[in-house]
Amino acid sequence: MVRTRWQPPLRALLLLVLVWLPQSLSLDLIAYVPQITAWDLEGKITATTFSLEQPRCVFDEHVSTKDTIWLVVAFSNASRDFQNPQTAAKIPTFPQLLTDGHYMTLPLSLDQLPCEDLTGGSGGAPVLRVGNDFGCYQRPYCNAPLPSQGPYSVKFLVMDAAGPPKAETKWSNPIYLHQGKNPNSIDTWPGRRSGCMIVITSILSALAGLLLLAFLAASTTRFSSLWWPEEAPEQLRIGSFMGKRYMTHHIPPSEAATLPVGCEPGLDPLPSLSP
């Protein structure tokens, strides 16, 4: 009687194991760890996005042209609870990040990840920017901005066209986003500044004052001719003699001009030298 009562559960458990075991054994584990791009890019980690290197030359032996390569994004503390979806209908979307702690986005095909040397190319940096689509909240598999600092962990999952997963990579190391500061929390008191910064500020202030004084001096010299116009120098005629002018008070100028030499009043007449 006891064997008869426990026989159906054992059969159901055995059937579940037989169904799950081939799927787990057929899932290839690729020895690749996703990571932040090594390219020297500004803003490769922001408050809502981060840039991964593209997994080129990674899936060539595990993916066919009809397969899809998905990026799984999860909070680091929820990555161990993530279970690979068995069908396309079970793929978690972005809103589930806030409820379940994970979602899938950025579906790629193998031809979008060509295996080639990009160091000599003229195109842009080969990166996958997570959280870069600011207007996709209503679309499935949205790549919307990330809601918090994290940390986040990611992995790539290869799914067959029929749905079951075929291969996956390892989880990345925790990725922390930048966190902005509240303007009210920034201390602007000069006493908090370092000694070097105070010295630099003093030097710059002194230089600014010297430049201002030099500008004012140059402006004064340049425009002084407009404020005080120079008098034209008196021109001298060749052969002229300038000396003091003696004016007599008892002889009108008109009469003094007509008197012969030696007849000036008040002077004795010159003696005549004739016999």
From Swiss-Prot:
Top-rank taxon of the source lineage equals Eukaryota
What does UniProt give as the signal peptide span? Answer: 1-26
State which ranges are Cytoplasmic (membrane side): 218-275
> What are the annotated glycosylation sites?
N77
| InterPro entries linked | Uroplakin-3
Q: Could you say which tissues express the protein in this record? A: Expression is urothelium-specific.
Q: How does it sit in the membrane?
A: Single-pass type I membrane protein
Query: What is the predominant subcellular site recorded for this chain?
Result: membrane
Location comes to: Cell membrane
What residue ranges are annotated as transmembrane? 197-217
Q: Which residues lie on this side of the membrane: Lumenal?
A: 27-196
- Record keywords: Cell membrane, Glycoprotein, Membrane, Signal, Transmembrane, Transmembrane helix
**BP terms from Gene Ontology:** negative regulation of D-glucose import
State a GO cellular component annotated for this protein: plasma membrane
| PANTHER family for this protein | UROPLAKIN III, UROPLAKIN-3B
The UniProt similarity line reads:
Belongs to the uroplakin-3 family.
Q: What does this protein do?
A: Component of the asymmetric unit membrane (AUM); a highly specialized biomembrane elaborated by terminally differentiated urothelial cells. May play an important role in AUM-cytoskeleton interaction in terminally differentiated urothelial cells. It also contributes to the formation of urothelial glycocalyx which may play an important role in preventing bacterial adherence.
Per UniProt, subunit arrangement is: Heterodimer with uroplakin-1B (UPK1B).
Q: What is this protein called?
A: Uroplakin-3b
Q: Which organism is it from?
A: Mus musculus
